[in-house]
């Protein structure tokens, strides 16, 4: 065979081998495709799985991962909204541990901090927020002049995360209001802000920031509400509203609200009682509130109601009196106000009932809004004596306090089958007790624990006057 024939022969063999190899590749690919197709059609309707299938032929070994995820259209699942439920009692408490302190007045001497009053705290499942009524002004600014006034068109309800000084950069607008309450039902936030003239004030209800309902003053005499959190359970929220004199018989309504809409209301028949600025908390299937008697009582009135708005009323029996001004501790009353010449006026406050016992929060001073302490009276809900079983100091009597109120952290947040009781204390600075042109406050908050705690003084601590006051 001559060289040319050898070349032709080698070329022909190469072409044949190449052709055979190509055909084998095509055959292998077809085999893979048909095998995959058959497996998909045979397993249609079975759960998805990941299988490893090995294919062999004379030319190569191919290991292919085949995922049996044949086309299925599934609607995206929407997680169920969690609502606060009823049925939990208050968690056992031996004392009170600090939760937060905002130091707003100290920081405000050189920072952009709102002039505020009536701060309160409320918690959703995911966060706790400080709500407060601004005066449309900042500390150490000319617009802070005259902010001792309670009701003005510049007052708004705003909120910020707990433990921070309330400023324009961290605060959220909630409502135009000079009296307010707010609470979460779990999925959303309810706010109720009251504004307008004294004789025709209107309450504007919002759910997640959208106006959902209104309520007009029904007695034409400074309709007002809690200045602390409302209470939500089983998709409904509850609050109390007062209309009428601050120093005589007034009129009261319990409101039942769902997603910002008033779905029930009941007038409270409370002749001889005076309910203002109630501090409320969930208790089993009920809501319990301890309020301010600005008319005659140095002891605090209470109201308990259920989801049907059936209610009971009374006064905290204990001779450890909770209001300010007040007489020295003595003999209390379960059904009527204790006056002793000190019952008129008052300050917002709170108590927590534990069976026959009661934790009472109160100022240390009998006459002025200064100092603060928590007193445990083991029989104070049913007995009128003045015996107490322990005191925890919160603010010493040389430093200003102010309003105080309750809030709670629910089992949906903590995972516990009980409700954690908590409280906040406002520390008012400026007018009328100090030589400034303004009135504002900071706040501190504590929660109940069933472990060790301590007494101390956690005052506001700001050095006054500010530059604007000089």
UniProtKB/Swiss-Prot annotation:
<keyword id="KW-1043">Host membrane</keyword>
<feature type="binding site">
    <location>
        <position position="293"/>
    </location>
    <ligand>
        <name>Ca(2+)</name>
    </ligand>
</feature>
<feature type="region of interest" description="Hypervariable stalk region">
    <location>
        <begin position="36"/>
        <end position="88"/>
    </location>
</feature>
<feature type="binding site">
    <location>
        <position position="323"/>
    </location>
    <ligand>
        <name>Ca(2+)</name>
    </ligand>
</feature>
<dbReference type="GO" id="GO:0046761">
    <property type="term" value="P:viral budding from plasma membrane"/>
</dbReference>
<comment type="similarity">
    <text>Belongs to the glycosyl hydrolase 34 family.</text>
</comment>
<feature type="disulfide bond">
    <location>
        <begin position="280"/>
        <end position="289"/>
    </location>
</feature>
<feature type="binding site">
    <location>
        <position position="297"/>
    </location>
    <ligand>
        <name>Ca(2+)</name>
    </ligand>
</feature>
<keyword id="KW-1133">Transmembrane helix</keyword>
<feature type="disulfide bond">
    <location>
        <begin position="278"/>
        <end position="291"/>
    </location>
</feature>
<keyword id="KW-0472">Membrane</keyword>
<feature type="binding site">
    <location>
        <position position="292"/>
    </location>
    <ligand>
        <name>substrate</name>
    </ligand>
</feature>
<feature type="glycosylation site" description="N-linked (GlcNAc...) asparagine; by host">
    <location>
        <position position="62"/>
    </location>
</feature>
<feature type="binding site">
    <location>
        <position position="117"/>
    </location>
    <ligand>
        <name>substrate</name>
    </ligand>
</feature>
<feature type="glycosylation site" description="N-linked (GlcNAc...) asparagine; by host">
    <location>
        <position position="399"/>
    </location>
</feature>
<keyword id="KW-0812">Transmembrane</keyword>
<feature type="topological domain" description="Intravirion">
    <location>
        <begin position="1"/>
        <end position="6"/>
    </location>
</feature>
<feature type="binding site">
    <location>
        <begin position="276"/>
        <end position="277"/>
    </location>
    <ligand>
        <name>substrate</name>
    </ligand>
</feature>
<keyword id="KW-0106">Calcium</keyword>
<dbReference type="Pfam" id="PF00064">
    <property type="entry name" value="Neur"/>
</dbReference>
<feature type="binding site">
    <location>
        <position position="151"/>
    </location>
    <ligand>
        <name>substrate</name>
    </ligand>
</feature>
<feature type="region of interest" description="Head of neuraminidase">
    <location>
        <begin position="90"/>
        <end position="470"/>
    </location>
</feature>
<feature type="disulfide bond">
    <location>
        <begin position="422"/>
        <end position="447"/>
    </location>
</feature>
<keyword id="KW-0325">Glycoprotein</keyword>
<dbReference type="GO" id="GO:0016020">
    <property type="term" value="C:membrane"/>
</dbReference>
<feature type="transmembrane region" description="Helical">
    <location>
        <begin position="7"/>
        <end position="29"/>
    </location>
</feature>
<feature type="disulfide bond">
    <location>
        <begin position="183"/>
        <end position="230"/>
    </location>
</feature>
<keyword id="KW-0479">Metal-binding</keyword>
<comment type="function">
    <text>Catalyzes the removal of terminal sialic acid residues from viral and cellular glycoconjugates. Cleaves off the terminal sialic acids on the glycosylated HA during virus budding to facilitate virus release. Additionally helps virus spread through the circulation by further removing sialic acids from the cell surface. These cleavages prevent self-aggregation and ensure the efficient spread of the progeny virus from cell to cell. Otherwise, infection would be limited to one round of replication.</text>
</comment>
<keyword id="KW-0378">Hydrolase</keyword>
<feature type="glycosylation site" description="N-linked (GlcNAc...) asparagine; by host">
    <location>
        <position position="69"/>
    </location>
</feature>
<feature type="disulfide bond">
    <location>
        <begin position="232"/>
        <end position="237"/>
    </location>
</feature>
<feature type="glycosylation site" description="N-linked (GlcNAc...) asparagine; by host">
    <location>
        <position position="57"/>
    </location>
</feature>
<keyword id="KW-0946">Virion</keyword>
<feature type="disulfide bond">
    <location>
        <begin position="91"/>
        <end position="418"/>
    </location>
</feature>
<feature type="disulfide bond">
    <location>
        <begin position="123"/>
        <end position="128"/>
    </location>
</feature>
<feature type="glycosylation site" description="N-linked (GlcNAc...) asparagine; by host">
    <location>
        <position position="417"/>
    </location>
</feature>
<comment type="subunit">
    <text>Homotetramer.</text>
</comment>
<keyword id="KW-0326">Glycosidase</keyword>
<feature type="active site" description="Nucleophile">
    <location>
        <position position="403"/>
    </location>
</feature>
<dbReference type="GO" id="GO:0020002">
    <property type="term" value="C:host cell plasma membrane"/>
</dbReference>
<dbReference type="InterPro" id="IPR036278">
    <property type="entry name" value="Sialidase_sf"/>
</dbReference>
């Amino acid at each position: 065979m001559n060289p040319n024939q050898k070349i032709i022969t080698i070329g022909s063999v190469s072409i044949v081998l190449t052709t055979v190899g190509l055909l084998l590749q095509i055959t292998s690919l077809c085999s893979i495709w048909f095998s995959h197709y058959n497996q998909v059609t045979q397993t249609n309707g079975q759960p998805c799985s990941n299988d490893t299938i090995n294919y062999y032929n004379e030319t190569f070994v191919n290991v292919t991962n085949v995922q049996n995820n044949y086309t299925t259209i599934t609607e995206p699942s929407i997680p169920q909204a969690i609502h606060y439920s009823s049925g939990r009692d208050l968690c056992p408490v031996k004392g009170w541990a600090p939760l937060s302190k905002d130091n707003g007045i100290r920081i405000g001497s050189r920072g952009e901090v709102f002039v505020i009053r009536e701060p309160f705290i409320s918690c959703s499942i995911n966060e706790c927020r400080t709500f407060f009524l601004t005066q449309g002004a900042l500390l150490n600014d000319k617009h802070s002049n005259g902010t001792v006034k309670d009701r003005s068109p510049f007052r708004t309800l705003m909120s910020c995360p707990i433990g921070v000084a309330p400023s324009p950069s961290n605060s959220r607008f909630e409502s135009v209001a000079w009296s307010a309450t707010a609470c979460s039902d779990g999925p959303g936030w309810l706010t109720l802000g009251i504004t307008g003239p004294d004789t025709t004030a209107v309450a504007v209800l919002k759910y997640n920031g959208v106006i959902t309902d209104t309520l007009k003053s029904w007695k034409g005499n400074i309709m007002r509400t809690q200045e602390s959190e409302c209470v939500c359970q089983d998709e409904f929220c509850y609050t109390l509203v007062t209309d009428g004199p601050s120093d005589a018989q007034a009129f009261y309504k319990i409101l039942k609200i769902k997603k910002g809409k008033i779905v029930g209301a009941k007038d409270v028949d409370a002749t001889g009682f005076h309910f203002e600025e109630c501090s409320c908390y969930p208790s089993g299937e009920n809501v319990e509130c301890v309020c301010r008697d600005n008319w005659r009582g140095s002891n605090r009135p209470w109201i308990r109601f259920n989801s049907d708005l059936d209610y009971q009323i009374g006064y905290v029996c204990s001779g450890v009196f909770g209001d300010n001004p007040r007489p020295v501790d003595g003999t209390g009353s379960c059904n009527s106000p204790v006056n002793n010449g000190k019952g008129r006026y008052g300050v917002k406050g709170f108590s927590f009932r534990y069976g026959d016992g009661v934790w009472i929060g109160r100022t240390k001073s009998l006459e002025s809004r200064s100092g603060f302490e928590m007193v445990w009276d083991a029989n104070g809900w049913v007995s009128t004596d003045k015996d107490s079983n322990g005191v925890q100091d919160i603010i010493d009597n040389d430093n200003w306090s102010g309003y105080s109120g309750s809030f709670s952290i629910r089992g949906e947040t903590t995972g516990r089958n009980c409700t954690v009781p908590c409280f906040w204390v406002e520390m008012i600075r400026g007018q009328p007790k100090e030589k400034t042109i303004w009135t504002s406050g900071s706040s501190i908050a504590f929660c109940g624990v069933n472990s060790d705690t301590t007494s101390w003084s956690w005052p506001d601590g700001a050095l006054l006057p500010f530059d604007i006051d000089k």
